[in-house]
Amino acid sequence: MRQTKTGILLANLGTPDAPTPEAVKRYLKQFLSDRRVVDTPRLLWWPLLRGVILPLRSPRVAKLYQSIWMDGGSPLMVYSREQQQALAARLPDTPVALGMSYGSPSLESAVDELLASDVDHIVVLPLYPQYSCSTVGAVWDELGRILARKRRIPGISFIRDYADDGAYIDALAKSARESFARHGEPDVLLLSYHGIPQRYADEGDDYPQRCRDTTRELVSALGLPPEKVMMTFQSRFGREPWLTPYTDETLKMLGEKGTGHIQVMCPGFAADCLETLEEIAEQNREIFLEAGGKKYAYIPALNATPEHIDMMLKLTAPYR
């Protein structure tokens, strides 16, 4: 009897191919066309997206990408490739592919790569620690569409999320402690998660609870008094209410209150990207300091640290 051959698919959001208005426009068009991301009726959304949002936002977002672009590409792609390579090095007999919901390499190219390696079973690990319909749900949807076009469908194990997994919490705690050792213990540790529309949560998305689960476990692991830790939500888009409190407004408030030393961690981002390196490390730093704060440090994402790769090994082990 033939032994089952398993492959691993690491999934993340995606990134433009270049820091140019044209590349950003292509990426944003695909991203903002997904109903999991924006569920506004299409007759209303298409004219707004194509006639207003893409022409106005693409040049502006391209400039932001230019400020963080690395020699090997966008930070998200550089760190995601490092994660893939590090995990593959630890699992020499297991093919590991990288796929993005939007842009390239696509999820379909990752599935094709694994099938070409003759795998019978794919472990899908979306690198979103806290489930949301707009992230993990989008991976699930696209995976279904991809497999619907295949004659040979492999077995699939799909890891929904890992918000309170012990190895994940340990990796976050180690990263925070290293930052405290480097910068001193902050007056407030602010945990900033990507926001979603409040309506999504009202309709059943358990993302807010999964963020609270991560926060609770991390506070316990660090042994910090609860009053020294705050949980906020960033990157809101559009006019409808999103999860609160908002990161930028909270940092402004803390600066105005005279809070001297803030450190910010983004536990929901498995790899540094525009939302962490530009929005949090730069824009929100300015907000805090201009409001009266004294010291601000961003704690990097887990990226390809050994502890993060250990976590991936642990999460996928039951299915390999």
UniProtKB/Swiss-Prot annotation:
State one molecular function term (GO): metal ion binding
Per the record, the gene is hemH
List the source organism: Salmonella typhimurium (strain LT2 / SGSC1412 / ATCC 700720)
Name of the protein in question: Ferrochelatase
Q: Give the highest taxon in the source lineage.
A: Bacteria
| UniProt-annotated binding residues for Fe cation | H194, E275
Assembly behavior: Monomer.
Task: Please tell me whether the keyword Metal-binding is annotated for this protein.
Answer: yes
Which reaction equation describes what this protein catalyses? heme b + 2 H(+) = protoporphyrin IX + Fe(2+)
NCBIfam families assigned to the protein according to its UniProt record, in alphabetical order: hemH
Q: Which UniProt keywords apply?
A: Cytoplasm, Heme biosynthesis, Iron, Lyase, Metal-binding, Porphyrin biosynthesis
